């Protein structure tokens, strides 16, 4: 059994799983919206309260992993930690729990997510978009004979939290000018990335697959899914027309009304519009009329890679996680993980 913790810009997640033959066999997942990246785009700093929220959540995850009988644990951080000058403060707090926190580059995040997604698509050529809070990772390629082929991989600084903080008011209905600016920002970054020779010269993707809370929320909202059912959402598609309709609905509602929509987590309401704009622009630019959502995301890729390293096999991506024996992890909050003010 292996445990992996992914600390994202919006959400902190834990997966505890058995992995064999490069596939995740059994898994339990936990998720908590902590909004680590709030304000980072403007200040370049992690908010102290956000750091504490993440710390308390991770402490509970370490305890849960121990109770599940896990032998080793991996802890990674993504966009918000990459951007923040005070990310070491969070790193020290996590280290006090006995973890080895690793800030992974965007390109590695993209490759790990692709690895997680690809197990459901055989050898097909797919474009995977991991649209998170601070960034969107794009990876185009396939898996053939257990070898990952990725001719195109990019990490773009555009995500639901970044777009919201930069262009959209969290408490009010956005103006048409703000919406247009958000669309233009996302569109330009996507167009620049997809205009590169690596993408243009690669075999065209058969399918567009999206991971992350925005993608899964769009599927759930479109079906008015209550309660959330990952089995229903996984590998289900949504049309570009339905994404546009959901964006138009969200843009007309204040945050407190968005939070009441069936299929949407209340804590995700402040950033869902920004995330929807990002994915709509991606569909527009790539020309895909349908986007498939996947629950097999970065966590799956982390699990597969961690299992390979634990078993002494080569990592399937050009990166090795640091597996911390779980008996070295403390579990439960340390008495003084933060400096006194």
PLM segments and residue spans:
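Helical "lid/coupling" subdomains associated with nucleotide-phosphate turnover
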Residues: 2, 16-19, 35, 39-68, ...
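Beta-strand initiation motifs
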Residues: 22-27, 146-151
